Amino acid sequence: SANPTGPLHVGHGRGAAVGSSLANLMLAAGYDVTREYLINDAGNQMHNLALSVNARYLELFGKEVSFPENGYHGEDIIVTARRIKEKYGDKFLHMEETERLSAFQTLAKDEKLAALREDLEAFNCKFDVWFSEQSLHDAGKIKEAVDTLQKKDYVYEKGGALWFRSTKFGDDKDRVVIRDNGVSTYFAADIAYHQNKFQRGFDRIINLWG
């Protein structure tokens, strides 16, 4: 998977090519294979995408804005803002910022995801399922996964946060699943995603990281 916040880079392409080749080999060997793309469409990176597009959009109307500290500085963000202006004009200028950011996050995500699909198809890398990380949050699957771990005593509280006992499984340190502000981590979402995979009937999962 790659975050739908910008173009694919070489590392993404390498992972996609390796995964696609593995899937093709296993299909040729007679295995039942599902090629799934996890869309990382939740969390801070998506919020930073919305903030970045918001800044570029406002600049197009002559507004003086400070660019977000952790924003995306690529030319593609400017292009996205221009397309939004061309299609919607000044519609979003008159919205509350929260509403405008929500709209920009959706519009930018859809555009970036379409570009990712196009790039992947260009070198014949196909996916059967496009799975949204946000859908796990919306369905309460993150909490469900953490609750499951707590019942098995794999999670403990320290410093107001919830920690997964990953050292029991060979990790060099335990990992936070719920921060002290109550917000789940990407690690918690990954756990929920894998639990969801097994709930959907998969018995073997090959992950391509990076």
Task: Identify the residue ranges that each predicted region occupies.
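NTP-dependent nucleotidyl-transfer catalytic core
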Residues: 1-210
